[in-house]
Curated annotation (Swiss-Prot):
PANTHER family: E3 UFM1-PROTEIN LIGASE 1
Lineage summary: Eukaryota, Metazoa, Chordata, Craniata, Vertebrata
Name of the featured protein: E3 UFM1-protein ligase 1
Processing after translation: Ubiquitinated, leading to its degradation by the proteasome. Interaction with CDK5RAP3 protects both proteins against ubiquitination and degradation via the proteasome.
Region of interest: Involved in CDK5RAP3-binding: 121-250
A Pfam family hit: UFL1_C
Disulfide-bonded cysteines: none
Amino acid sequence: MADAWEEIRRLAADFQRAQFAEATQRLSERNCIEIVNKLIAQKQLEVVHTLDGKEYITPAQISKEMRDELHVRGGRVNIVDLQQVINVDLIHIENRIGDIIKSEKHVQLVLGQLIDENYLDRLAEEVNDKLQESGQVTISELCKTYDLPGNFLTQALTQRLGRIISGHIDLDNRGVIFTEAFVARHKARIRGLFSAITRPTAVNSLISKYGFQEQLLYSVLEELVNSGRLRGTVVGGRQDKAVFVPDIYSRTQSTWVDSFFRQNGYLEFDALSRLGIPDAVSYIKKRYKTTQLLFLKAACVGQGLVDQVEASVEEAISSGTWVDIAPLLPTSLSVEDAAILLQQVMRAFSKQASAVVFSDTVVVSEKFINDCTELFRELMHQKAEKEMKNNPVHLITEEDLKQISTLESVSTSKKDKKDERRRKATEGSGSVRGGGGGNAREYKIRKVKKKGRKDDDSDDETQSSHTGKKKPEISFMFQDEIEDFLRKHIQDAPEEFISELAEYLIKPLNKTYLEVVRSVFMSSTTSASGTGRKRTIKDLQEEVSNLYNNIRLFEKGMKFFADDTQAALTKHLLKSVCTDITNLIFNFLASDLMMAVDDPAAITSEIRKKILSKLSEETKVALTKLHNSLNEKSIEDFISCLDSAAEACDIMVKRGDKKRERQILFQHRQALAEQLKVTEDPALILHLTSVLLFQFSTHTMLHAPGRCVPQIIAFLNSKIPEDQHALLVKYQGLVVKQLVSQNKKTGQGDYPLNNELGKEQEDVANTRKELQELSSSIKDLVLKSRKSSVTEE
């Protein structure tokens, strides 16, 4: 009952409150949304929608929840996780991060994560536990463990060294943290190990063998060396090739180097390398700062050795001899080093070229070279005189001598340029602490491969620059002959020096020899001046006139034959008499061009071409046409060219008259008859008889080859009695038979078949007998007629 009344009193109180309460207005959800949007648009309210769109949240609330989440997660949270927890777009999270970092200095953003100082302190405590356990930790391992960048971890842990972390970091390599005990233990091991080393030792091999931490070893080693606790030096820095050189070894090394240099006067770079000195040049320059040294390719030499070489070279130049410096130098020095040393020595002499360098190490004075040239002087005169007698033509002109001089000057110019380049190269490769001037020329034989290499170098420059120019036509001696001659007069000379000296002398010897030949020729032709020359011209004109008239008469005789026979006779005449008269004219002109010919018949077509190349343009045109007409097929063309050539050469040709022609006919017939009397050759008897019978019948001369004899005999058929012609034909048949048997015997060799031997020998004997019997009768056909005609005349 009491409960019921209690309920009644409570309800009465509620009713009373409802009666006195003020009325409140409630807005609908749509109205609320419109009002909030309007406030946001007017920038009177700053709120952010959640991702589901059901709630609004203020930026301050976002920041508060981010701080709360960072605290809940132990001081490290990913911003992606924050976006999922707070349920807003990621851009709003990123916008609030900047405000949080500015307002709270102990919070920082690292790789998309918020990290505060509390987290870093706990991380440092964990690192310290690991460090105390193992003695060292590496930043790289910590980066993998905590998924943080190395620079950030290094900075964070460095700030906590000595406060949270009991250890220190390597100043040279900030990637490792050590404990003091670890460093002290390794320092003791390093000190003990390197104190026991007595020779240069690679640091890298010790690291791999004893398990040292590489960077710690270098730091401790550098500290011990700088403090003087370890006596030695580390060569090569902190590299794989670093070498520790103890002081005891360095002292022994320096003692050996000083002793060797004092005794020998030079230092070889390879020897220093074998001693463990990696940079020999720098070592020598550092150790001998005040000593005058010459640095070569593979060694350096002292001033004493340089002075010794200089004295030997000076003595050779002053005494007019030669010297090879190779025996004066240590055997370990290469030829290249010896050449550099010699070039440096030559700079100490006067700037005028007083010596020539051969084979890189041989210095030859100019006087010695001149003496060698003089050794050939007598031999030159002997050979020149012999040459003038034996050689059918000598074309030693001013142009030849001028060309030799040009080649010599160009060669000298090229040598000077090579010397200049070599001097500059030497100044770059070798150095002397002192002055000097360059003077000597150097002569080298170019080692040319047989195939494949194109001269890419400059020893062939002279030859290539004169490609196409005519070389001297007369040479003195070949190089091997010069070498043999020099070996007889130069004792104990290196073979390579002899070869190079011979090659060097070839051009000046040839030039001198040409001058000697010219001098010999001039002396032999001096007597040909004055009245003698007039007599020579007179004789030439007489001989040319005789041959000219003979050609004219021979031309008349050819016209009795058919065209094909005329062509053969014309060709024979051009190759014989016409060529003789041409050679006479060429020989006459060549005498003015320093040409010597004993027999004009020895002048060939090639020699005529050489003579033409020496003539003046006016004379060359006419003589060239005359030379070319010998290969034509017309006597008239040749006569025309001959007239032009004679006029160009001022040679007067006397044309024959009737009386002169009769004299020539008589003399020609008499000469052939005299030859016919003495000959016993059947073929020649037939040839001479046929030509003489032709002259008797036609009163003209005929110059015919042997192959035209049948045509001459055929022509005589109607010109001589029938019995004489029959005798000629019979004799011709026997001559042909004999020639055929001789040719057949030559073709078969000396061993014909046995069954034919007797028959052939019998035929040959019968033919020979018949020819002998008929020869006198054939001769009488001409000789009897000759006697009667002489009587008539």
